[in-house]
């Protein structure tokens, strides 16, 4: 952290969308600031891709953007308000389909598709980044309106570069990036000491928190105390938000020994009852709803202690008898 070789990707020209473009950075045509991969000092170790010699080989954008990949209400509720405080789902305004995206951590809009917005993909990409009528006409999703699944859809990893053939996206995949170093540090200090100083928060967690949220208050000990928050919860929240859709979540839940509480929860979606979704998504009327009027996508889930363990390969169990062992059930 003190070496200075790496830094968070936050070009001023990309403003509050810098986080989004980090994950789809290819050549100068992949973002409105004409930045290429040499401008990314955040990735430490990556799986490199190139459109000519080593493309990704799978059309991630087309398979994800507005498609059958769903996000839960649990995740949507974790994004902070722009004032740095958690939302209260019982009192938050959900009347219009885009209300819950307003005045939130900007990463929510960088990661999730907002109803009513326009999105570009490989089958309808950006032309000149002007947002003019011609570019909007070329968009793959105009006036996006969720009408399947749980109603939340991601657009992280979805390229906006025009004319990308199927499977030819070529942005790099981060195996470890500087943001992970920062948040590992914050969590490790807190877990070691049972507390963390404002100085340590300033050089770690608050850098990711404020990358595209310059007006959001810092997370400090006074802020936690004044707002009756829990520091461990906020550190874990920041990690969950920052690493959304990067395959960290299940390992984190196991590491924190909270999977037994989190995994059995119902998978719920948008609040449908009593909102404009009733008019905009009438086909969801048959879907089961919970007490808040939210779509229930899946229930009756369970978690057993054995799920904390990695499976034992059956071919490694054959040579020796393990009948004397008692495995968790």
Where are these regions (language model features)?
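Signature of lipid phosphatidyltransferase scaffolds
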Residues: 75-84
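Acidic/polar-rich alpha-helix caps and helix-coil junctions
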Residues: 1-62, 83-325
